[in-house]
Curated annotation (Swiss-Prot):
NCBIfam families in the record: rpsG_bact (TIGR01029)
GO CC, any one term: small ribosomal subunit
A Pfam family recorded for this sequence: Ribosomal_S7
InterPro entries (UniProt xref): Ribosomal_uS7 (IPR000235), Ribosomal_uS7_bac/org-type (IPR005717), Ribosomal_uS7_CS (IPR020606), Ribosomal_uS7_dom (IPR023798), Ribosomal_uS7_dom_sf (IPR036823)
Protein name, as recorded: Small ribosomal subunit protein uS7
Description of how the protein assembles with itself and partners: Part of the 30S ribosomal subunit. Contacts proteins S9 and S11.
Domain of life: Bacteria
Function: One of the primary rRNA binding proteins, it binds directly to 16S rRNA where it nucleates assembly of the head domain of the 30S subunit. Is located at the subunit interface close to the decoding center, probably blocks exit of the E-site tRNA.
Keyword Ribosomal protein in annotation: yes
Length: 156
């Protein structure tokens, strides 16, 4: 492996409406074929619908939903001797956010509703109530880590 210096991450510009970097990242992850304006419209519509329904601030709703979906530990495969072990490791904060966003978007895409903004709004609402596919995914990852706790000493 080459011994090069670590590359600095490019700063992400905050979204134009609410000036949030996390929301901007979410917009970029949701974007398909470079159509950012459509992605922004979907998210803003979903958050506006939730604001009307829950009477809370847009960003508060979004941050709470992300918090409920963020994983704390995950498992990684580690080969020791002739066998492969699933070793539980703690997740970095940047990866926590990325995984949570990805899981919410995947769960929203799998839903059967009319528009993506409705599906996204319902998935975020379910995440706030600790139910829904994204939260189930987090619990599944945590269960795997708990089941393989015996292999934690193989961490590297």
């Amino acid at each position: 492996m080459p011994r090069r210096k670590m590359v600095n991450q490019r700063a992400i510009l905050p979204d134009p409406k609410w000036n949030s970097e996390i929301l901007s990242k979410f917009i970029n992850i949701l974007m398909v074929n470079g159509k950012k304006s459509i992605s922004e419209k979907i998210i803003y519509t979903a958050l506006n619908n939730l604001k009307k329904k829950l009477n809370k601030d847009h960003l508060t709703i979004f941050d709470l939903a992300l918090e409920k979906v963020r994983p704390i530990v995950e498992v990684k495969s580690r080969r020791v001797g002739g066998s492969t072990y699933q070793v539980p490791i703690e997740v970095r904060s940047s990866r926590r956010n990325a995984l949570a966003m990805r899981w919410i978007i995947e769960a929203a895409r799998k839903r059967k509703d009319k528009s993506m903004s409705l599906r996204l709004a319902k998935e975020i609402e379910d995440a706030l109530e600790n139910k829904g596919t994204a939260v189930k995914k987090r619990e599944e990852v945590h269960r795997m880590a708990e089941a393989n706790k015996a292999f934690a000493h193989y961490r590297w």
